[in-house]
UniProtKB/Swiss-Prot annotation:
Binding site for Zn(2+) 2: C80, H82, C99, C102
The protein's name: RING-box protein 2
Gene that specifies this protein: Rnf7
Subunit structure: Catalytic component of multiple cullin-5-RING E3 ubiquitin-protein ligase complexes (ECS complexes, also named CRL5 complexes) composed of CUL5, Elongin BC (ELOB and ELOC), RNF7/RBX2 and a variable SOCS box domain-containing protein as substrate-specific recognition component. Also interacts (with lower preference) with CUL1, CUL2, CUL3, CUL4A and CUL4B; additional evidence is however required to confirm this result in vivo. Interacts with UBE2F. Interacts with CSNK2B, the interaction is not affected by phosphorylation by CK2.
Gene Ontology molecular functions: cullin family protein binding; NEDD8 ligase activity; ubiquitin protein ligase activity; zinc ion binding
Domain notes: The RING-type zinc finger domain is essential for ubiquitin ligase activity. It coordinates an additional third zinc ion.
Gene Ontology cellular-component terms listed: Cul5-RING ubiquitin ligase complex; cytoplasm; cytosol; nucleus
Family of the protein in this entry: Belongs to the RING-box family.
Enzyme Commission number(s) of this protein: 2.3.2.27, 2.3.2.32
Amino acid sequence: MADVEDGEEPCVLSSHSGSAGSKSGGDKMFSLKKWNAVAMWSWDVECDTCAICRVQVMDACLRCQAENKQEDCVVVWGECNHSFHNCCMSLWVKQNNRCPLCQQDWVVQRIGK
């Protein structure tokens, strides 16, 4: 355990009732009764960057940015759960009908923003 200097007990935070010492007597600083951890995600994407154009999938791809068509740029997910810009993937599929990341046959699972 830790060394205690000058006879003082270290303050111990506890989630259950019990004696925990502090500098000002036997009072606890606080007692944690209940804690609910919450996590939220803004989208369900394993990788947030398009592996073809290297731009974030929630932003427009380079081609749509150049042609000023940001609203038309949507994300496409394959059955392998990898996501890409639909514009990028449609060009990729013309040359190679496999996912650029895992090399599985490319089958569209869903398209959306």
